């Protein structure tokens, strides 16, 4: 065993882990603040279709997928801290691209192109940020606390979504898209300053298997994660348009309900994957997610939709750490960054594919249909998880 694998959690390590997670919260506001606003900006201000809305939201995740391998190698070979800080700076640059889209006196296609550039930069930054912070956290507290590391980072991410969605709509409605873009440009720089003095963890040495051999070890939990991700993708992409189409207010608070329930589950039950193993926790979580998405599909009122969003958030909450525990068990220490990056890439692919496909579904069958599609995906995720791990 390496020295790192023998580490136990100390107060100083916990405080460093908190600082990393808080910096993730600040940086991930670059995702949370614009998430409910971009569909409105693309559809209402630029005049594009639901499919183009899906592309504008989903393309970020394709950029994340394509750079996960680079982020994992960067964290494994040159240090997780470098990966995380580099990701924060890239997320700040995304806000600069959106600021240009808001301020330049150019045509709608050019504004849309600048928006897409910002989304691509954000995807590049997100892959480095999350892969770096997960690997950094594991180096600080040790792999036996992998569920804790993933839970704290997840709380930061979805806390940023919960706080960012209504705040983003508020900033946009009162001050416009330029103010929103400027805010997203500044927050990652604050996160970078907050994390600058957290100690490095050494890069691992040893033989490094190829990326494809690592994927061969993690594809089963990755597939379960991808099927879970459809639910969040349809909420993040179409919930604001769903509410507007029904004449409901409080669209931003659906992501608050989702993110709040997500964080609460992590706080109360984030220890479960380390204690009981990932598979049982993942199956129960997918059942809860299914119930929430079915409520959103059938919701007669805004309040029922909010309950559905909260249930979906509660269901999604523990799936990443639950199946992530299985990933950490399967790979050697020197490729944990690559493995975690590849694992998260399954979710990114899900987010990226879901956006445009759900956009076509919404155009043909209405916005409720996308939530039914999410529920069906979660049910398939239950079956895949049970069958894969029973055979594995």
Curated annotation (Swiss-Prot):
GO terms for cellular component: plasma membrane. InterPro entries: MFS, MFS_dom, MFS_trans_sf, MFS_Transporters, MFS_YfcJ. It is a multi-pass membrane protein. Its main location: membrane. SUPFAM superfamilies: MFS general substrate transporter. The chain crosses the membrane at residues 22-42, 46-66, 97-117, 121-141, 151-171, 174-194, 224-244, 252-272, 276-298, 342-362, 369-389. It is found in: Cell inner membrane. It holds the Pfam family MFS_1. It comes from the Bacteria. Belongs to the major facilitator superfamily. YfcJ family. PANTHER family: PTHR23517:SF1, RESISTANCE PROTEIN MDTM, PUTATIVE-RELATED-RELATED (PTHR23517). This is Uncharacterized MFS-type transporter YfcJ. It comes from Salmonella typhimurium (strain LT2 / SGSC1412 / ATCC 700720).
